[in-house]
Regions:
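N-terminal core-binding DNA-recognition domain of tyrosine site-specific recombinases/integrases
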Residues: 11-73, 78-80, 96, 175-182, ...
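Catalytic-site neighborhood detector that most strongly recognizes the C-terminal catalytic loop/helix
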Residues: 151, 216-241
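Conserved tyrosine-mediated DNA breakage-rejoining catalytic core shared by Y-recombinases
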Residues: 88-94, 134-169
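Short, structural beta-strand-to-alpha-helix junction motif
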Residues: 1-6, 40, 136
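Basic, Lys/Arg- and aromatic-enriched nucleic-acid-binding interface segment
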Residues: 58-66, 77-133, 195, 246
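Short, basic, alpha-helical segments at the C-terminal edge of helix-turn-helix-like DNA-binding modules
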Residues: 241-247
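Short, basic (Lys/Arg/His-rich) helix/loop patches that form interaction surfaces
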Residues: 112-116, 125, 177-222
């Protein structure tokens, strides 16, 4: 049996969310099928697979490696093979850098063209794009936005089902993610960065981190804490001024 043949079975039996399955298929078609698709399941060229992984950006390589492991985990489960060519393979370390985001005043000062309303809505409510794209006027009532689904189906987790105070600017989002991402990129940010705008707004207005966790729909409080520890250069300057004022009062 060829890897391509087995993968078609995997898509039917693997237990993942529809969005995850969509991503699996895209990754396989783009990166893995040209390399291992025509190889026998029991005789994948490990060197060729490793070379492919090393040729990819670290994050893509990591996702592809996890997908190969998933494909062969299912193969072992269904007695198709007893090997996994992904065992022992490595990918380059993922470099984590500070993610750029805009503060609310910066967002509000910019012209976002045809997406003026939608961008401001994202920045003031902290919804994931897939959540915001599923919102209709019926989901906005009693001065709250009720988040109960995404464009891909159910919410990411139970904690993603929530309500957030409605602060205006609602206008239906486009059916595709790409136009708004292109709009955001022109200003050096991403659509997802507007969640950080919202989180930073909560932080600067004194909203407690546990409340922010609820509003952002984070299942892990550490995710919220990582956002809450975002510090702008201006805050460093302000901290210096505060300490200087304190010392001057003591003298």
């Amino acid at each position: 049996m060829l890897v391509n043949d087995w993968v078609e079975t995997v898509w039917n039996v693997v237990q993942v969310r529809p969005k995850t399955l969509h991503d699996y298929k895209r990754l396989y078609r783009r990166h893995l099928m040209p390399v291992i698709g025509s190889m026998p399941v029991n005789d994948v060229d490990v060197v060729a697979l490793q070379q492919k992984l090393l040729s990819l950006p670290p994050q893509s390589a990591r996702h592809c490696l996890m997908l190969v492991k998933t494909i062969y985990r299912e193969a072992k489960l269904y007695k198709v093979t007893n090997i996994n060519p992904a065992d022992g393979l490595k990918t380059a370390p993922i470099q984590i850098s500070d993610k750029k985001f805009l503060t609310w005043p910066e967002v509000d000062a910019k012209d976002w063209g045809r997406y003026n309303n939608q961008i401001r809505f994202l920045a003031l409510h902290g919804l994931r794009w897939s959540e915001a794209a599923a919102i209709t006027q019926a989901d906005i009532r009693d001065e709250f936005v009720f988040v109960s689904r995404t464009v891909n189906g159910p919410c990411k987790s139970k904690t993603s089902v929530r309500k957030v105070p409605y602060l205006g600017w609602f206008k239906p989002l486009p059916a595709s993610y790409k136009p708004m991402q292109k709009c955001a990129n022109r200003h050096g940010v991403t659509v997802h960065s507007f969640r950080r705008t919202y989180a930073y707004l909560l932080k600067t207005q004194g909203v407690h981190v546990t409340t922010a966790q609820k509003l952002l729909g984070h299942s892990d409080p550490m995710m919220t804490l990582r956002v809450y520890t975002s510090v702008l250069d201006s805050e460093i300057d302000d901290a210096g001024a505060l300490l200087a004022n304190y010392l001057n009062r003591k003298i």
